[in-house]
A protein has these predicted regions:
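N-terminal glycine/threonine-rich, aromatic-flanked beta-hairpin/loop signature
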Residues: 77-140
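N-terminal helix-cap/turn-to-beta initiation motif at the start of protein domains
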Residues: 44-69
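C-terminal motif of bacterial Sec signal peptides marking the signal peptidase cleavage site
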Residues: 33-36
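Edge beta-strand at a domain terminus
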Residues: 43-53, 117-135, 170-200
Length: 200
């Protein structure tokens, strides 16, 4: 009698383990089938911004690649910048910037000597075209050129660029972006294609 009870208990334990294995197998099969119902396409937090970023890069990405320069000289400021954009998203650049102040000496208007601005130097970093709002949810989305660059010489605790500039267009000769350090009266800078050196 004792052996029948032990056999029945053993059968019960085996049946319970078998049922547990079947439940685990069923749950795994269900999980796999649910997971396979999804698309292989990535999901984006803002699909519209992603699509417009793709279009922006298809239209202007190849035109951005190359070297661009900008120079602006006035009575009180000389500014030159050269940017080289690579297809892999890397950036190299050079900035030369000098300023002087108007002064009056013995009733005569003069200028101080030219002084180098500490933001002059060479730098490396990355660039990216994006459709987004740099201000976050409160700002208006727009085409932007995002620049992140550090100076090549050690010891500077500030960036050469860490910004998203409004991007207008790039073509065979001109790159038009919102001014950052300097700008035209309308707030824009027109870079010209090609390598160049400062004239000052």
């Amino acid at each position: 009698m004792c052996s029948n009870i032990k056999i029945n208990q053993l059968k019960f334990v085996i049946d319970m383990k078998t049922m547990k294995l079947w439940r685990i197998a069923f749950m795994m099969l269900t999980a796999f089938s649910i997971a396979s119902c999804g698309s292989d396409e990535p999901r984006y937090a803002d699909p519209e911004a992603h699509e417009k970023t793709v279009q922006l890069n298809e239209q202007y990405g190849p035109l951005m690649v190359g070297t661009w320069h900008y120079e602006n000289i006035s009575d009180t400021q000389c500014y030159f910048e050269r940017l080289t954009f690579q297809a892999d998203g890397t950036l190299t650049g050079m900035r030369k910037w000098q300023t002087r102040k108007p002064v009056t000496i013995d009733g005569k208007e003069q200028h101080t000597d030219w002084e180098d601005v500490e933001l002059s130097g060479t730098f490396t970093g990355t660039w990216q075209l994006r459709y987004w709002s740099p201000e976050g949810n409160s700002g208006e989305k727009r085409n932007c050129l995002q620049l992140t660059a550090t100076y090549d010489d050690a010891g500077r605790d500030y960036m050469a660029y860490s910004c998203a500039l409004t991007f207008a267009y790039a073509d065979a000769t001109t790159l038009r972006i919102q001014g950052y350090y300097v700008k035209a009266p309308d707030g824009w800078i027109n870079y010209q294609r090609g390598p160049s050196e400062p004239s000052f």
